[in-house]
Amino acid sequence: MRPIDIRPDKLAQEMLDYTSKLGQGMENLLNADAIDTGVSPKEAVYSEDKLVLYRYDTPAGVTPQKTPLLIVYALVNRPYMTDIQEDRSTIKGLLATGQDVYLIDWGYPDQADSALTLDDYINGYIDSCVDYLCETHEVDQVNILGICQGGAFSLMYASLHPDKVKNLVTMVTPVDFKTPGNLLSAWVQNVDIDLAVDTMGNIPGELLNWTFLSLKPFSLTGQKYVNMVDMLDDPDKVKNFLRMEKWIFDSPDQAGETFRQFTKDFYQKNGFINGGVKLGGKEIDLKNVDCPVLNIYALQDHLVPPDASKALNPWSAARTYTELAFPGGHIGIYVSGKAQKEVTPAIGKWLNERS
């Protein structure tokens, strides 16, 4: 076996470089300003309980489409992921294509919200926002962009209110919750959801956050902090890293009854595929989703595997069904440079062709 060639001079230089980088990194961390997220100008135009509906300012020189676009985000994280910084903003990209963008901010549920159900979210909050947009813009239908769990909510809404949805875009949205390789679904199959909700009321956001991180423990809880050392001497990269950390750990609690129903009816019983889920006395049926659909999924998504999203195709009755595969992960589809160049313009183009 060939002996390892250790040169003291090179080793000493590497140690000096490493120490210098750590020192510069500590200075950058100490000097980092407050980490701004949600950078695009917006105005709160409607509120109900914890919910706030925001309208984003149309850029100068851009004429907005007549049909407004409502973004329905997931409950489990904060929606500023879609507008996390100036050069990594799904919102900004959509505005540039002429979309009149509105976004639902669900806020931070507390114990007063523990009895909220899926019916409250779908037939209550989302429907109220859609009615507000229809009245404000004097239209009969809106475009909807649903993100992750918000995509599942949007499918439920389009199933129950097909007359109010002109076009539907779903991003990294679970449809078949029991596809092979779905680690999150496999993990939750044997969890006693009733016991968890009955014991805690609302489900702590921190608990869910650590559950998601545990699906890729090495890369998400260890390796990224080791890799961070290599960027500490770059102030811009430090701020980018801190923005992502802020978002990852900004996890609202989940309204207990909604969590119970969504987890049991969809993760455990696969409600979109097997049926049997009723809201407001009407059954959720994807065959009622007859508007044009653009279904976008990420090829390296560990939370919503591609097959879980692609299952929408055979189950919906969309007049036009289009798929877009993105070569990245669950978060990269919003924040990567490639996504800014490919995904957001594709959404805008698809919507504009059907305006």
Curated annotation (Swiss-Prot):
Q: Does the keyword Acyltransferase apply?
A: yes
Keywords attached to this Swiss-Prot or TrEMBL record, sorted alphabetically, are: Acyltransferase, Cytoplasm, PHB biosynthesis, Transferase
Keyword DNA damage found:
no
The entry's active site is: C148
- List the InterPro entries hit by this protein, alphabetically: AB_hydrolase_1 (IPR000073), AB_hydrolase_fold (IPR029058), PHA/PHB_synthase (IPR051321), PHA_synth_III_C (IPR010125)
- Give GO terms: molecular function aspect only: acyltransferase activity
Q: What's the Enzyme Commission number for this chain? A: 2.3.1.-
Compartments in which it is found: Cytoplasm
Q: Which GO terms describe its cellular component?
A: cytoplasm
The GO annotation for biological process reads: poly-hydroxybutyrate biosynthetic process
Mind telling me which PANTHER family this protein's record contains? Answer: POLY(3-HYDROXYALKANOATE) POLYMERASE SUBUNIT PHAC (PTHR36837:SF2)
Role, per record: Polymerizes D(-)-3-hydroxybutyryl-CoA to create PHB which consists of thousands of hydroxybutyrate molecules linked end to end. PHB serves as an intracellular energy reserve material when cells grow under conditions of nutrient limitation.
- Subunit composition and interactions: Forms a heterodimer with PhaE, which may multimerize in the presence of 3-hydroxybutyryl-CoA.
Name recorded for this polypeptide: Poly(3-hydroxyalkanoate) polymerase subunit PhaC
In the UniProt record, the gene name given for this protein reads: phaC
